[in-house]
Curated annotation (Swiss-Prot):
Gene Ontology terms: cellular component: small ribosomal subunit
Assembly notes: Part of the 30S ribosomal subunit. Contacts proteins S9 and S11.
Family statement drawn from the similarity comment of this UniProt entry: Belongs to the universal ribosomal protein uS7 family.
GO biological process, one term: translation
Name of the molecule in the record: Small ribosomal subunit protein uS7
Alphabetic keyword roster: Ribonucleoprotein, Ribosomal protein, RNA-binding, rRNA-binding, tRNA-binding
Native source organism of the sequence: Trichodesmium erythraeum (strain IMS101)
Keyword rRNA-binding (UniProt): yes
Gene3D superfamilies reported for this sequence: Ribosomal protein S7 domain
Length: 156
């Protein structure tokens, strides 16, 4: 692994319907076995369900949900002289968004419901209202960081 320079990240293209990079990111997280069109259908159906239920713009609700889910701090394991400490670290914005989308998809999948689109729609609406499993995960992460504040000086 070369240590010479930082690798340029590939730009994420916006999705065709909403022209949003965030939508493309969640489609890529939902996609399984390379079936991107299926993933797009799931996301668009979820957005349609949100629009029918709330009579508001689904993209705004989605962005609000992701903002609510984005963690500010997380803990990373750091080994110091035979002991492993959970060191609280600030989360970069791109990592925060990635974690938010990961939790959103993970807890949507584990949720009860008929279709993945409905499960995703329900989890998105819960996240926008600051309830639901994904929000609980973010709160848990923040609590863990707060509990291990004493080890913050081990930051690297």
């Amino acid at each position: 692994m070369s240590r010479r320079r930082v690798i340029q990240r590939r730009p994420i293209p916006p999705d065709p319907k909403y022209n949003s990079r965030l939508v493309t990111m969640i489609v890529r997280r939902i996609m399984r076995h390379g079936k991107k069109s299926v993933a797009y259908n799931i996301v668009y159906d979820a957005f349609k369900a949100i629009e029918e239920r709330t009579d508001s713009d689904p993209l705004e609700l989605f962005e609000k949900a992701v903002r609510n889910l984005t963690p500010l701090v997380e803990v990373k394991a750091r080994r110091v002289g035979g002991a492993t400490y959970q060191v609280p670290m600030e989360v970069r914005s791109d990592r925060g968004t990635t974690l938010a989308l990961r939790w959103l998809v993970q807890y949507s999948r584990s949720r009860g419901g008929k279709t993945m689109a409905m499960k995703l729609a329900n989890e998105l609406m819960d996240a926008a209202n600051e309830t639901g499993s994904a929000i609980r995960k973010r709160e848990e992460t923040h609590k863990m960081a707060e509990a291990n504040k004493a080890f913050a000086h081990y930051r690297y």
